[in-house]
Structure formats: structure tokens, C-alpha cells
């Protein structure tokens, strides 16, 4: 069983997009589980900002840990932060997922009808995140 909570955080610490990937059956999942992962991701924002100055890499592996949850992050050149809260180690899968989602985010950002730093509501973006989540995180 593995669970991943993915969130894209804007420049003003506002959530732009969020998605949960899980192999756990929906009936077995607890409702407060979602609030916990959101809280962990929000609490890790300061650590992400701290770590981004210490490395030239865009990807930050396991920057924080809370009980059984790990936090991994990816920072774009425009200071948009991709954060994954996960309960098992999968560094290679997370790296590939971040790279694919970054590419998808760039394509979405180039859309003339999308304003940077606003919530992403594109059905294609949602579909691609679902595909990449199943491919890299849940396989």
C-alpha cells in the first residue's frame, strides 16, 4: 500500500493544483488522512525555501519527514514548487514524475488563457497527472 499527495504551490504560497494517488481502496481510506498530508505539505514550504539555496538542483529529495511520511520537492525556475508527501521511498519514480509534470506544467503555462499563479483547471492537465501518477508512482 502506498499513498502520494501531490501539490503545486505558487509563488505566494497558494495551492495551484493538488492530486492524491493511492493503491488503498477508497472505502478504507480515512477522511482526515487528506487533511494530514495537506498540513505536512504546507509545513514543509519553509524547508523547501531553505533547501533551494543550498543546491543548484531543481529536485530536492526527502527534505522532511513526519512520522511515516516523507516530503520531496521540485522547484521550477519561476519559483513554483512541486511537493509530494509520500509514505514509501521511490526516489527514481518521484524524479520521473516531477520531470513529466514540469513539462506538462510548462505546456499549460504557455496557454494564452492561463494566468500564472492561478488554480489549474485544465482537464488535459488532470488526465496527464493521473497517467503519470499511475506510471511512475503506483507501478
From Swiss-Prot:
**Record protein name field:** Probable trafficking protein particle complex subunit 2
Q: Which organism is it from?
A: Drosophila melanogaster (Fruit fly)
Q: Name one GO biological process term.
A: spermatogenesis
Q: Which GO terms describe its cellular component?
A: cytoplasm; endoplasmic reticulum; nucleus; perinuclear region of cytoplasm; TRAPP complex; TRAPPII protein complex; TRAPPIII protein complex
- PANTHER family the UniProt entry points to: TRAFFICKING PROTEIN PARTICLE COMPLEX SUBUNIT 2 (PTHR12403)
Subunit architecture? Part of the multisubunit TRAPP (transport protein particle) complex.
Q: What is its main location?
A: cytoplasm
In the record, the note on similarity to other proteins reads:
Belongs to the TRAPP small subunits family. Sedlin subfamily.
Q: What does this protein do?
A: May play a role in vesicular transport from endoplasmic reticulum to Golgi. Involved in dsRNA uptake.
Q: Which UniProt keywords apply?
A: Cytoplasm, Endoplasmic reticulum, ER-Golgi transport, Golgi apparatus, Transport
Q: Please give the superkingdom of this protein's source.
A: Eukaryota
- Compartments, as annotated in UniProt: Cytoplasm, Perinuclear region; Endoplasmic reticulum; Golgi apparatus
* InterPro entries given in the database record: Longin-like_dom_sf (IPR011012), Sedlin (IPR006722)
Q: Which Pfam families match?
A: Sedlin_N
Amino acid at each position: 500500500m502506498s499513498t502520494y499527495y501531490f501539490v503545486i504551490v505558487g509563488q505566494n504560497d497558494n495551492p495551484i493544483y493538488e492530486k492524491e494517488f493511492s493503491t488503498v481502496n477508497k472505502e478504507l481510506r480515512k477522511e482526515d488522512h487528506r487533511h494530514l498530508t495537506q498540513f505536512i505539505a504546507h509545513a514543509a514550504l519553509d524547508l523547501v525555501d531553505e533547501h533551494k539555496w543550498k543546491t543548484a538542483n531543481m529536485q530536492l529529495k526527502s527534505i522532511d519527514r513526519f512520522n511515516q511520511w516523507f516530503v520531496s520537492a521540485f522547484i521550477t525556475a519561476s519559483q513554483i514548487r512541486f511537493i509530494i508527501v509520500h509514505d514509501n521511498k521511490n526516489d527514481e519514480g518521484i524524479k520521473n514524475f516531477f520531470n513529466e509534470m514540469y513539462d506538462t506544467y510548462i505546456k499549460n503555462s504557455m496557454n494564452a488563457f492561463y494566468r500564472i499563479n492561478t488554480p489549474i483547471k485544465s482537464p488535459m492537465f488532470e488526465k496527464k497527472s493521473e497517467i503519470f501518477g499511475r506510471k511512475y508512482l503506483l507501478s
